[in-house]
């Protein structure tokens, strides 16, 4: 049976989009700048030298970056790729995770999300009062834009003493809630997020994110793998839902199910960290052979651990770690399978601030029936969803053009 294995390298942009100036992101290039820093010896913590990505290079990542940005990533292997490679522009209004993923699955976000734009006192008082009342809270902390790690150091101890949850946001359409797993309780945090999700309906906010953490005090706090995203449902049927409705298997690895609000997902594998994500992907490929299938994984640590934290050396090391296991999936492909590597937005670790960057994404497609070579600029991320639909014999999506035609 035909299958599509889709691996999302969360935040691996490959060059600023034409509308990047609108977002303050003109000149951003997540991969290009990581490669530049690595080649210059400025990303040598835990690794050293130029980026060593032989397998991603074989997939055409460097060549896709060159098509997108006009220059080849410094230090990467320029050998001819064995896959189809190109880059895609985003037509969705935002540079956030749901917008990128939904557009990849054929449903671009052509409306404007709601945002909490004020950096301090970010949330409407009426909303905060309603959350406190309905959840029976002693109060709240934060109410601001913040980096997830910084705000734990600043407010984590007070949260543990008072039981007040930490509320914060970013440039994305998001309401984030951080609570200590042991002193506050994980299920209690999830219930608080559910209440908040319901109260946010009039505000058109994309996601509520539970951000559980552990640790004894400042400098010792760490997020756990029990993050949970409560997203609104996509406004139309994604290619995932179309396959599920047709009786196929749609397998979520990691946070994919949360991003699509669990719509169109038939099987879920919880996984945290690269090794678990790789292992779960390989397990799913072994288990789902008898029906047409989409197996989709999100490698979130690129974004959450290195992009937002502006950790260039960590991002470089993570790319090399990802690259080392890529051959396992390539070897597990059947004769009629395709492997697609892409991203959902950028998050340039060399860029000012802590937010995502508006960039093109790589579109890399490998398979025994796939013609290697350039597929050029794709007018929308939805070309990926359209290509998956074509590969699996599903009805055409409303957006996108297949690069497999």
From Swiss-Prot:
One family name in Pfam for this protein: Metalloenzyme
Q: What detail does the entry give on cofactor binding?
A: Binds 2 manganese ions.
Cofactor(s) needed by this chain: Mn(2+)
Q: What is its EC number?
A: 5.4.2.7
Binding positions for Mn(2+) 1 per the UniProt entry: 10, 344-345
Which cellular compartments is it found in?
Cytoplasm
What is the recorded name of this protein?
Answer: Phosphopentomutase
The organism's taxonomy opens as: Bacteria, Pseudomonadati, Pseudomonadota, Betaproteobacteria, Neisseriales
């Amino acid at each position: 049976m035909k299958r599509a294995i889709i691996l999302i390298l969360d935040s691996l942009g490959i060059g600023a989009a034409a509308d990047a100036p609108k977002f303050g992101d003109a000149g951003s290039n997540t991969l290009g700048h990581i490669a530049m820093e690595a080649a210059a010896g400025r990303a040598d913590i835990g690794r050293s030298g130029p980026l060593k990505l032989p397998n991603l290079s074989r997939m055409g990542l460097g060549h896709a970056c060159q098509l997108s940005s006009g220059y080849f990533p410094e230090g990467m292997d320029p050998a001819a790729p064995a896959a189809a490679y190109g880059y895609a522009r985003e037509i969705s209004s935002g540079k956030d995770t749901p917008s990128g993923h939904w557009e990849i699955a054929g449903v671009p976000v052509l409306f404007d999300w709601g945002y909490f734009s004020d950096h301090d006192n970010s949330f409407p008082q009426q909303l905060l009062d309603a959350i406190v009342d309905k959840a029976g809270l002693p109060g709240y902390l934060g109410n601001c834009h913040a980096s997830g790690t910084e705000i734990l150091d600043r407010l984590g101890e007070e949260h543990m003493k008072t039981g007040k949850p930490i509320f914060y946001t970013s440039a994305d359409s998001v309401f984030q809630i951080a609570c200590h797993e042991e002193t506050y309780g994980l299920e209690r945090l999830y219930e608080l997020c559910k209440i908040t999700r319901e109260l946010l309906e009039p505000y058109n906010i994309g996601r509520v994110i539970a951000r559980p953490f552990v640790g004894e005090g400042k400098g010792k706090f760490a997020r756990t793998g029990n993050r949970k995203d409560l997203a609104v449902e996509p406004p139309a049927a994604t290619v995932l839902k179309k396959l599920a409705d047709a009786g196929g298997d749609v397998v979520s690895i990691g946070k994919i199910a949360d991003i699509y609000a669990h719509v169109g997902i038939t099987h879920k594998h919880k996984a945290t960290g690269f090794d678990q994500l790789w292992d779960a992907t390989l397990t799913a490929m072994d288990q789902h052979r008898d029906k047409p299938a989409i197996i989709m994984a999100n490698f979130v640590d690129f974004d959450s651990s290195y992009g937002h934290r502006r950790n260039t050396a960590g991002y470089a090391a993570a790319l090399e770690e990802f690259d080392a296991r890529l051959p396992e999936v390539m070897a597990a492909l059947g004769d009629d399978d395709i492997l697609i590597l892409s991203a959902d937005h950028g998050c340039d670790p060399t860029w000012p601030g802590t937010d995502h960057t508006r960039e093109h994404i790589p579109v890399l497609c490998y398979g025994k029936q796939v013609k290697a070579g350039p597929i050029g600029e794709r007018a929308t991320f939805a070309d990926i969803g359209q290509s998956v639909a074509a590969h699996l014999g599903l009805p055409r999506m409303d957006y996108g053009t297949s690069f497999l035609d």
